[in-house]
């Protein structure tokens, strides 16, 4: 299987998000990379499902809460920017204050 660097990045994010989901299911609080991966994956998958940029900006901020993260993680993440593929092309989605 020959993957482009971008495809490899997307696969890595998807795998990291899956690890984060399993940890949340076990009651483990997420660290910084896990939180970013979970938010990023939600935005990418929502875009593939045909949702709008505005919808994904809002939905990205509803993926995880402060209580699901280790202490200080929410304060470290002011915004998450994701290049996502929408039905009409690739667009940059910025999620401001994604952990509330």
Swiss-Prot record:
Hydrolase among keywords: yes
Top enzyme category: hydrolase
One GO term (biological process): urea catabolic process
Keyword Cytoplasm found: yes
Biological pathway: Nitrogen metabolism; urea degradation; CO(2) and NH(3) from urea (urease route): step 1/1
Gene Ontology cellular component list: cytoplasm
Disulphide bridges: none
Enzyme Commission code: 3.5.1.5
Pfam families linked: Urease_gamma (PF00547)
Subcellular location: Cytoplasm
Catalysed reactions listed for this entry: urea + 2 H2O + H(+) = hydrogencarbonate + 2 NH4(+)
GO MF assignments: nickel cation binding; urease activity
Keywords attached to this entry: Cytoplasm, Hydrolase
Annotated NCBIfam families: PRK13241.1 (NF009712), urease_gam (TIGR00193)
Subunit relationships: Heterotrimer of UreA (gamma), UreB (beta) and UreC (alpha) subunits. Three heterotrimers associate to form the active enzyme.
Family recorded in the similarity comment: Belongs to the urease gamma subunit family.
Protein name listed in UniProt: Urease subunit gamma
Species for this entry: Ruegeria sp. (strain TM1040)
Lineage of source species: Bacteria, Pseudomonadati, Pseudomonadota, Alphaproteobacteria, Rhodobacterales
Gene transcribed to yield this protein: ureA
């Amino acid at each position: 299987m020959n993957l482009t660097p971008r495809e490899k990045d997307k696969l890595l994010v998807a795998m990291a998000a899956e690890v984060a989901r399993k940890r949340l299911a076990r009651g483990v609080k997420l660290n910084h990379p896990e939180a970013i991966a979970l938010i990023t994956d939600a935005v990418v998958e929502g875009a593939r499902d045909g949702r709008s940029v505005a919808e994904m900006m809002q939905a990205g901020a509803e993926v995880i809460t402060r209580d699901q993260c280790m202490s200080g993680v929410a304060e470290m993440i002011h915004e998450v920017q994701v290049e996502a593929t929408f039905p009409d092309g690739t667009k940059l989605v910025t999620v401001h204050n994604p952990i509330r």
